[in-house]
């Protein structure tokens, strides 16, 4: 039988006393009362803060959104299938944040900034809050630099500036996403970081966009944040804020960014679902009362920063889908009132073969010509005026059979101008190409052509100027002015190309 030695026991006790750590760990915990539909009701969590992250014992993370007298309403960032009634929950003391770094460029991630493209983890040393305050009045400066989309109809008549928020609105299948992706493609070589946020889209649609960007080398400067239609409502609600946080990271590092939200109405639907399940009182169209704030705090983060902050910018292009052209629905009117203008795409124009199907009459940019270079201002004014007169005359001409020669000429010119606004998808034009196209149309050089020949002639003219008159593009890009020298070069090119074209025909 082993002998018990008193000195050994006293040594062990002394050692334990010396090693005793007095540190008291206070954990704010609670118990799950009920779980389902992506919502959990928690008893306890007395000191939890609004928007704080909470962790369930099986690892799921949630956000405390409803703080009530007897329980806390938590939305889950996952399916929560393993959460049971009675399981414990602890408050983390943190609010939602994501890692950020240059390594995210070229990747496809989810709302929690986790990669979903199967290309491994993304390294980052910094993190950023998903929801951060928008720059104040003193931190901003007015928009003055153009953000070229490569689409004549937009760059000439509805110009977008760096730091602007321009809504793209229209029915389904009218080419809204195509306008946005063309804008991304046109940023190649312009040192603009692009973020495309897909909210509640079909996974196949997102894959199509990613493939289109990869094929044309645009993923090098693009980040895609995607939460598909089968994602939990919480993640669809968070995705735009994740995209904004990534764009802000680059903006505050003196870079220019472009962010596309496709589309915020799906985010509003996800937020409505969460709010109704949390038993918040419904308002118009069953949306909660703060749905305007949902979008305003997101879109206000787009800005052109002051010179003290490095003059970085974040340009936002939210895309909103309307139901049979109803722009006066709740979400469209909300977003229209927050943004600095809208580009309206019409199903009728799209079906008539006018693509991009931009209705120039009701589209507007509240920044206007401040976001255009001088050369574009010189030629775009005449185009706007002539198209407006043409639209008026066309409506009038439907009721009248005998029109005088001047009216017939004006209608013929208008039809050719409308033709020059047509562009194939994924074929953006440089500013110089746009200027020569508009100048050719507004100065009557297309009047002698059949409407069917206009696009072919313009394509050949652009190639001709690029190869035979490279000085034209050099003058426009260096001086940003449509000088007399550039005008003379262009006139010569048009005459020479016209002769060649007529010989071919």
From Swiss-Prot:
Entry binding sites for ATP: 170-177
Enzyme superclass (EC): translocase
UniProt topology in membrane: Peripheral membrane protein
Gene3D superfamilies named among the record's database cross-references: 2.40.30.20, ATP synthase alpha/beta chain, C-terminal domain (1.20.150.20), P-loop containing nucleotide triphosphate hydrolases (3.40.50.300)
A single GO molecular function term of this UniProt record: ADP binding
Main localization (coarse): plastid
Transmembrane segments: none
Catalysis: reaction(s): ATP + H2O + 4 H(+)(in) = ADP + phosphate + 5 H(+)(out)
EC number assigned by the record: 7.1.2.2
A Pfam family per the record: ATP-synt_ab_C
Keyword Nucleotide-binding: yes
Entry's localization field: Plastid, Chloroplast thylakoid membrane
InterPro entries in the record: ATP_synth_asu-like_sf, ATP_synth_asu_C, ATP_synth_asu_C_sf, ATP_synth_F1_a_nt-bd_dom, ATP_synth_F1_asu, ATPase_a/bsu_AS, ATPase_F1/V1/A1_a/bsu_N, ATPase_F1/V1/A1_a/bsu_N_sf
Origin superkingdom: Eukaryota
Site (Required for activity): 363
One GO cellular component term: chloroplast thylakoid membrane
PROSITE patterns: ATPASE_ALPHA_BETA
Keyword Plastid: yes
Keywords of this entry: ATP synthesis, ATP-binding, CF(1), Chloroplast, Hydrogen ion transport, Ion transport, Membrane, Nucleotide-binding, Plastid, Thylakoid, Translocase, Transport
Functional note: Produces ATP from ADP in the presence of a proton gradient across the membrane. The alpha chain is a regulatory subunit.
Subunit structure: F-type ATPases have 2 components, CF(1) - the catalytic core - and CF(0) - the membrane proton channel. CF(1) has five subunits: alpha(3), beta(3), gamma(1), delta(1), epsilon(1). CF(0) has four main subunits: a, b, b' and c.
Family that this chain belongs to: Belongs to the ATPase alpha/beta chains family.
Protein name: ATP synthase subunit alpha, chloroplastic
Organism: Oenothera argillicola
Name of encoding gene: atpA
């Amino acid at each position: 039988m082993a002998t018990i030695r008193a000195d050994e026991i006293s040594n062990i006790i002394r050692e334990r006393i010396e090693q005793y750590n007095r540190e008291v760990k206070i954990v704010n915990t609670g118990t799950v009362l009920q779980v389902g539909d992506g919502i959990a009701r928690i008893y306890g969590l007395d000191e939890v803060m609004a928007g704080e992250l909470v962790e369930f014992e099986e690892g799921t993370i949630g956000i405390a959104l409803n703080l009530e007298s007897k329980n806390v309403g938590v939305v889950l960032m996952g399916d929560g299938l393993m959460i049971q009634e009675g399981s414990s929950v602890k408050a983390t003391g943190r609010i939602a944040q994501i890692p950020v770094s240059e390594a995210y460029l070229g990747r496809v991630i989810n709302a929690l900034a986790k990669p979903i493209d199967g290309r491994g983890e993304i390294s980052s040393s910094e993190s950023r809050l998903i929801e951060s305050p928008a720059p104040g009045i003193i931190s901003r400066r007015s928009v003055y630099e153009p953000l070229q989309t490569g689409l004549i109809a937009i760059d000439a008549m509805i110009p977008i500036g760096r730091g602007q928020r321009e809504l793209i609105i229209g029915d389904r299948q009218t080419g809204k996403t195509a306008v946005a992706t063309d804008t991304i493609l046109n940023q190649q070589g312009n040192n603009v970081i692009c973020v495309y946020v897909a909210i509640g889209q079909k996974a196949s649609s997102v894959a199509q966009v990613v493939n289109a960007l990869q094929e044309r080398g645009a993923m090098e400067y693009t980040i895609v944040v995607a939460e598909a239609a089968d994602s939990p409502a919480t993640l669809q609600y968070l995705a735009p804020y994740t995209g904004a946080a990534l764009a802000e990271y680059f903006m505050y590092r003196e870079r220019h960014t472009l962010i596309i939200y496709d589309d915020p109405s799906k985010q509003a639907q996800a937020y409505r679902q969460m709010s109704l399940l949390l038993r918040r009182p419904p308002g118009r169209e069953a949306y909660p009362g703060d749905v305007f704030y949902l979008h305003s705090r997101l879109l206000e983060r787009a800005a052109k920063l002051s010179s003290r902050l490095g003059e970085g910018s974040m340009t936002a292009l939210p895309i909103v889908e309307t139901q049979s052209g109803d722009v006066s629905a709740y979400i469209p009117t909300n977003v229209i009132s927050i943004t600095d203008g809208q580009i309206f795409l019409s199903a009728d124009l799209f079906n008539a073969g006018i693509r991009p199907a931009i209705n120039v009459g009701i589209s507007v940019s509240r920044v206007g010509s401040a976001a255009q270079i001088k050369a574009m201002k010189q030629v775009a004014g005449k185009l706007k005026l002539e198209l407006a007169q043409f639209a008026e005359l066309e409506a009038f001409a439907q009721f009248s059979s005998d029109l005088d020669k001047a009216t017939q000429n004006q209608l013929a010119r208008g039809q050719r101008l409308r033709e020059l606004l047509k562009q194939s998808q994924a074929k953006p034009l440089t500013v110089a190409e746009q200027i020569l196209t508009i100048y050719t149309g507004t100065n009557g050089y297309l009047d002698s052509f059949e409407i069917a020949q206009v696009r072919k002639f313009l394509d050949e003219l652009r190639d001709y100027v690029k190869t035979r008159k490279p000085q034209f593009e050099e003058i426009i890009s260096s001086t940003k002015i449509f000088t007399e020298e550039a005008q003379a070069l262009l006139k010569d090119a048009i005459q020479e190309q016209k002769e060649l074209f007529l010989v071919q025909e």
